């Protein structure tokens, strides 16, 4: 069958590709046999570097395009929106429409590997998705473990059987960046953190609290002083103490980390909303559920704040300067859920 007589105009392959491996390649190869064009949608494209997403969108795009230097494969970015499937679906449909504006017969292609593959059934416009068989159980998590635990590039030889050679060469060049030393240190810190809980009879679930404090079009944030996420912006918050309510814990953490010059009764009286955020993979430290409180202080002069405790710095940021790539874990999406700034 020639390229001009493919059954589908375009097939869409969604993933994080962190990094791109032979399992991903098998899907793209299958898509190229079935469609004129393939749109590779890269999730978590605007997240700050972390253990689960150590590569930027541009780096992942370069790894994919090293294997497919053809106009038939379009590599495009998308954000995650873990708490709003409708926004996520709309973002993907919009970016695909831009990538292949003339395509009429569009479908999804992928492999239903686990709970993260639910997306294959939530795009009603793209019917009859193409299912592709798993390729040898290749897992990007295992690849990340290799690259985050070794600085010896000879150790990467084992990856040559599960990654395209051009992708592996591209990735090896990226791993010399100083940013990866930070991610490697964070990986070791998280590993030790999890090791401390190995003897527990059940995997632990942690409860945290966060404060989304706004005033006069500004949001109160802190700069994290410790790993994971050292140096990233974050909401004031932390782990819930056993003897306190979630509300009291949120106010306590807010006061400890920002020294905000607002009385506790005023803070409590300014709470406009509260919501639980429980995406299973929201934290690298393990299963962590957070309760966030929206505290709207109205208009007026911004209260003085000062970083303390776990926070290196506390500061007010205009809404339009709150950027996903600067924020820790899923904090951008918590903020967006309350303020709709995304």
Predicted regions and their residues:
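Conserved G/P- and acidic residue-centered "switch" motifs that form tight phosphate/ATP-binding loops
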Residues: 21, 236, 254
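Functional cleft and adjacent loop/helix regions within the main domain
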Residues: 90-98, 106, 137-141, 155-184, ...
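A short, structural micro-pattern
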Residues: 102, 137, 205, 287-289, ...
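Nucleotidyltransferase catalytic core that binds NTPs
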Residues: 1-192
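Short, conserved active-site loops that position catalytic residues or coordinate cofactors/metal ions
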Residues: 41-46, 229-237
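Unchanged
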Residues: 239-337
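N-terminal strand-loop-strand
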Residues: 191-235, 262, 297
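Short, well-ordered beta-to-alpha junction loops that form the rim of enzyme active sites
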Residues: 110-114, 224-225, 291
């Amino acid at each position: 069958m020639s390229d001009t007589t493919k059954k589908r105009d375009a097939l869409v392959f969604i993933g994080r590709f962190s990094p791109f491996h032979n399992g991903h390649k098998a899907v793209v190869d299958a898509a190229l046999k079935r469609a004129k064009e393939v749109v590779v949608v890269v999730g978590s494209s605007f997240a700050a570097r972390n253990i689960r997403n150590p590569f930027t969108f541009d780096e992942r795009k370069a790894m994919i395009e090293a294997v497919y230097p053809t106009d038939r494969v379009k590599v495009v970015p998308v954000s995650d929106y873990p708490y709003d499937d409708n926004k996520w679906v709309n973002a993907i449909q919009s970016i695909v429409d831009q990538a292949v504006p003339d395509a009429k017969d569009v479908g999804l292609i992928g492999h239903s590997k686990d709970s993260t593959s639910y997306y294959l059934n939530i795009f009603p416009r793209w019917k009859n998705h193409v299912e592709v068989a798993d390729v040898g159980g290749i897992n990007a998590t295992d690849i990340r473990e290799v690259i985050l635990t070794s600085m010896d590039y000879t150790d990467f030889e084992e990856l040559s059987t599960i990654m395209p050679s051009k992708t592996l060469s591209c990735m090896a060049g990226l791993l010399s960046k100083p940013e990866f030393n930070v991610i490697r240190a964070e990986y070791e810190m998280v590993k030790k953190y999890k090791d401390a809980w190995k003897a527990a009879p059940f995997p632990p679930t942690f409860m945290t609290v966060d404060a989304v404090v706004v005033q006069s079009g500004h949001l109160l944030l802190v700069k994290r002083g410790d790993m994971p996420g050292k140096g990233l912006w974050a909401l004031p918050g932390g782990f819930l103490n056993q003897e306190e309510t979630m509300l009291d814990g949120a106010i306590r953490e807010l006061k400890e980390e920002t020294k905000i010059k607002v009385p506790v009764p005023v803070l409590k009286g300014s709470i406009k909303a509260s919501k639980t955020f429980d995406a299973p993979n929201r934290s690298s430290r393990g299963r962590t559920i957070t309760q966030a409180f929206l505290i709207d202080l109205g208009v007026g002069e911004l209260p003085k704040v000062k970083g303390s405790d776990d926070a290196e710095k506390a500061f007010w940021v205009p809404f339009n300067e709150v950027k996903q790539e600067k924020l820790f874990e899923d904090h951008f999406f918590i903020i967006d859920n309350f303020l709709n700034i995304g």
